[in-house]
A protein has these predicted regions:
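Structured loop/turn residues at beta-strand edges in well-structured enzyme cores
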Residues: 12, 57-59, 122-123, 159, ...
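Conserved inter-motif catalytic segment of the P-loop NTP-binding fold
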Residues: 44, 53-140, 226, 249
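Alpha-helical scaffold elements adjacent to nucleotide-binding pockets in ATP/GTP-utilizing enzyme cores
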Residues: 31-32, 72-80, 109-113, 147-151, ...
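Residue-level signal for alpha-helix termini/capping positions
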Residues: 38, 115-119, 157
Length: 281
């Protein structure tokens, strides 16, 4: 997965999508899945601005959902197929409903089914876990958060695939919330945040982290509902002025965080806070 040639989600890695309720995360995930179902790359208009690597070898594409009802999952599947211009569910695509299982059993099923479908289809092209926080008891439990992110990172390496983790939290500026957010911030190769645009008819997608590059190299992308198409469609990129405003707003947020507990900082203390907040090593 890439935007304008900047890689976001790659093999052996985790890729995180985060955002609040009603921002269109599930529809965005559906667009990514649609791009992974065909043997030729879909145009970015179909995949809401993302460049998704096609799947000519029909490797397994796995979608685990902990959030939605079975009826909603089925409805979203229909939209994904329509977006991919398919009339039937490919044999290599498996969408699994996890909401009815206990949290412990959800991870067990993910582990076992990944192994099963890897052998059945000769490999795994893509995995999506919609609702990673629902695999543990609390998103603020440090031990559990470290364990689940480490385990998913391990599975991505074993099966040489990209695992997309969807986190249903609103980020705090450029930081993800909770211990699970902190772990994903450290381990994920890329993080995209989806939020409502100033124009409420649109959602805006922003890069919070890009391992091989800068988040500011990734344009802010827009998508919105189209009545005639009966699905979300790509609405292009935000302007250069909006990009500059975003940069300014994020820097203001970092400075506010730096001075949250003190009105005065030494130069060394300020450098340490800025390096920590902006993950500069």
């Amino acid at each position: 997965m890439a935007v304008n040639g900047v890689p976001l989600g790659t093999q052996d890695n985790l890729f995180c999508i985060t955002g609040g309720e009603g921002t269109g995360k599930s529809n965005y995930v559906g667009a990514i899945l649609a791009g992974a179902l065909g043997n030729k790359r879909l145009p970015i208009e179909k995949t809401l601005g993302l460049e998704i690597t096609a799947n000519p070898k029909d490797l397994a594409v796995l979608h685990y959902d902990t959030e939605q009802s079975e009826a909603q999952l089925h409805k979203n599947l229909g939209k994904t197929l329509r977006r991919a211009s398919l009339t039937a569910v490919p044999k290599f695509y498996h969408s699994l409903y996890l909401a009815s299982l206990s949290r412990k059993d959800r991870l067990k099923l993910i582990r076992e089914s990944m192994d099963l479908f890897h052998h059945k289809h000769g490999g795994i092209h893509l995995v999506v876990i919609d609702g990673i926080a629902d695999l543990i008891r609390s998103a603020n439990d440090e031990t559990e958060s470290i364990a689940i992110v480490d385990e998913l990172y391990r599975l991505a390496g074993i099966y040489n695939t990209c695992i997309i983790c969807v986190l249903h939290f609103v980020p705090n500026g450029i930081k993800l919330r909770g211990h699970i957010g902190s772990e994903l911030q450290r381990k994920a190769a890329g993080i995209l945040s989806i939020e409502k645009d100033d124009n409420p008819e649109y959602s805006v997608v922003k890069a919070l982290k890009v391992r091989d590059g800068s988040p500011l190299d990734v344009p802010m992308m827009l998508f919105g509902w189209d009545k005639e198409e009966d699905m979300h469609v790509y609405r292009g990129e935000k302007s250069k002025e909006d990009k500059e405003k975003r940069k300014t707003d994020e820097l203001i947020g970092v400075v506010k965080e730096a001075f949250r507990n003190s009105f005065k900082l030494t130069y060394q203390e300020l450098c340490e806070v800025l390096m920590r907040e902006m993950e500069i090593k």
